[in-house]
């Protein structure tokens, strides 16, 4: 919320600080940039590419907000703790935490290894749990925690997608219970559950979502995916970012403990 020249401007986040995990590219980058455009100062978290993260920082600064990039592997709890400590050390406080880091996985039940199970759940589930824990410990009163689920967690069943879907189903439960645990600090906890969203990862895995998907080009698969929604268009990172921006705002306060499907009605 913001007051400019004595006038209240709905939806603005001026004076707020947001930590967005996994925001060097894709949906996370779109969220970080959008929150920056709404006036928040942003901590861009990344695990691998400092160059990609710096591009996001530059976009946010170009929009008039401050931003820094902090490298931290969300699979490592000590690095999550350091991420939030450094965010507070730099900006003085944190008001919004968007838990976006994740990996995708496909495999028939008979073929899934222990190593693959641990790879997926260590980030999608365990990582998000401890991001939320550190967010609660560091967030100012009245803050926002926004987690990332998927429409495959319950409404959209995809063969050979059990690890990913299950890892996100746990997040749905986290959101519901965390909203109770965080009430003493007036922190709301919600989740977004994207459907197929056009990013580089989408093009890498879209053949898994479409029967005989290997027969089609990436462009053809994207066109086919658009018809999963009655709106007959694809979802894009900005579609997710717009909802996250609302949940982070004062106007989103009465939404709490909810996971919002963002799939254009595909499910």
From Swiss-Prot:
NADP(+) binds at residues 27, 73, 100, 133, 164, 168, 199. Its EC number is 1.1.1.-. GO terms for molecular function: oxidoreductase activity, acting on CH-OH group of donors. It is an enzyme of class 1 (oxidoreductase). Pfam families: adh_short_C2. SUPFAM superfamilies: NAD(P)-binding Rossmann-fold domains. Induction: Expression is positively regulated by the transcriptional regulator wor1. Expression is down-regulated during biotrophic growth within tomato leaves. The expression is induced at later stages of infection when conidiophores emerge from the plant and produce conidia. The keyword Secreted does not apply. Pathway: Pigment biosynthesis. Keywords: NADP, Oxidoreductase. InterPro entries: NAD(P)-bd_dom_sf, Sc_DH/Rdtase_CS, SDR_fam. The keyword Iron-sulfur does not apply. The active site is at residues 149-150, 164, 168. PANTHER family: NADPH-DEPENDENT ALDEHYDE REDUCTASE-LIKE PROTEIN, CHLOROPLASTIC-RELATED, RE15974P. Non-reducing polyketide synthase; part of the gene cluster that mediates the biosynthesis of the bianthraquinone cladofulvin, a conidial pigment not required for virulence but that plays a role in fitness and resistance to environmental stresses including UV light and low-temperature stress. The pathway begins with the synthesis of atrochrysone thioester by the polyketide synthase (PKS) claG. The atrochrysone carboxyl ACP thioesterase claF then breaks the thioester bond and releases the atrochrysone carboxylic acid from claG. Belongs to the short-chain dehydrogenases/reductases (SDR) family. This is Short chain dehydrogenase claC.
């Amino acid at each position: 919320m913001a007051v400019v020249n004595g006038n209240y401007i709905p939806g603005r986040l001026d004076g707020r600080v947001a930590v967005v995990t996994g925001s060097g590219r894709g949906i996370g980058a779109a969220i970080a940039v959008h929150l920056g455009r709404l006036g928040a100062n942003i901590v861009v978290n990344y695990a691998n590419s400092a160059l990609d993260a710096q591009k996001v920082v530059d976009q946010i600064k170009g929009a008039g907000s401050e931003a820094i990039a902090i490298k931290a592997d969300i699979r490592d709890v000590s690095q999550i703790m350091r991420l939030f400590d450094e965010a507070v050390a730099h900006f003085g406080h944190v008001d919004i935490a968007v838990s976006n880091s994740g990996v995708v996985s496909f495999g028939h039940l008979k073929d899934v290894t222990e190593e693959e199970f641990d790879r997926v759940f260590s980030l999608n589930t365990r990582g998000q749990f401890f991001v939320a824990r550190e967010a609660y410990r560091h967030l100012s009163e009245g803050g926002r925690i926004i987690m990332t689920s998927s429409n495959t967690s319950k409404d959209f069943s995809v063969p050979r997608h059990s690890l990913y879907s299950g890892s996100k189903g746990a997040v749905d439960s986290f959101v519901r219970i965390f909203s109770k645990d965080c009430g003493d600090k007036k922190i709301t906890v919600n989740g977004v559950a994207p459907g197929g969203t056009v990013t580089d990862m989408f093009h890498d895995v879209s053949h898994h979502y479409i029967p005989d998907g290997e027969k089609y080009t990436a462009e053809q698969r994207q066109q086919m995916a658009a018809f999963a929604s009655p709106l007959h268009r694809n979802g894009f990172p900005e579609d997710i970012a717009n909802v996250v921006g609302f949940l982070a705002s004062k106007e989103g306060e009465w939404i709490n403990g909810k996971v919002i499907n963002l799939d254009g009605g595909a499910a």
